[in-house]
A protein has these predicted regions:
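Short sequence/structural segments immediately N-terminal
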Residues: 1-181
Length: 181
């Protein structure tokens, strides 16, 4: 992953009521996405059955309002990891004996990283410690350094930004200073 400063434990879960409640998502009761017990008066009881990452089942929890996005996620690279398999097959070439080693490396590293909608648009990825970006506010365009390059920084991030010696950055970044999303 990339270099992202870890958040303090309280920063990972604090909901900024002023910011969050002013958003469309802030108008939805917590239990609509996260479950739990709305009538409970104690924290432990209120959090029984809590779903920490509802976007792991995006069709169920996000699809009612975000039908188009959740439908396209089924074929998205962060879900299918198709780009990795293209690379693995290219690197292995016509040498099937290379596949087991590459597949093992993929299973031990890359296959554990990829993520849900919320883990890019609401919080930092788990591999850099997780935690909400800005008090549970959903970011339509996530902050590149706290989301995209947090995972892809040591490999793809530097390549995208043109930080690898002798290799120019991605044309979208070089020419248009476009973020990766």
């Amino acid at each position: 992953g990339g270099d992202v400063a870890p958040l303090e434990p309280w920063e990972k879960a604090i909901v900024d009521a002023e910011k969050f409640l002013a958003t469309d998502h802030g108008k939805i009761a917590c239990i609509e996405c996260h479950s739990g017990v709305s009538t409970a008066t104690e924290k432990a009881a209120a959090h029984e059955g809590l779903i920490a990452s509802p976007s792991a089942d995006s069709q169920k929890y996000c699809g009612e309002c975000h039908e188009e996005q959740t439908a396209s996620y089924d074929n998205a690279l962060h879900n299918t990891q198709a780009g990795y398999w293209t690379t693995i097959n290219t690197r292995a070439g016509n040498m099937p004996e290379n596949h087991p080693a590459l597949e093992e490396m993929f299973g031990n590293h890359s296959a554990t990283c990829h993520t849900t909608c919320g883990e890019c648009h609401v919080s930092q990825p788990k591999n850099v410690g997780g935690g909400l970006f800005s008090g549970h506010v959903f970011e339509k365009t996530p902050p590149m350094t706290r989301s995209c390059t947090a995972c892809h920084g040591s490999r793809v991030g530097n390549e995208y930004l043109g930080k690898n010696e002798g290799i120019p950055g991605d044309v979208h970044f070089r020419e248009g200073r476009m973020n990766c999303v």
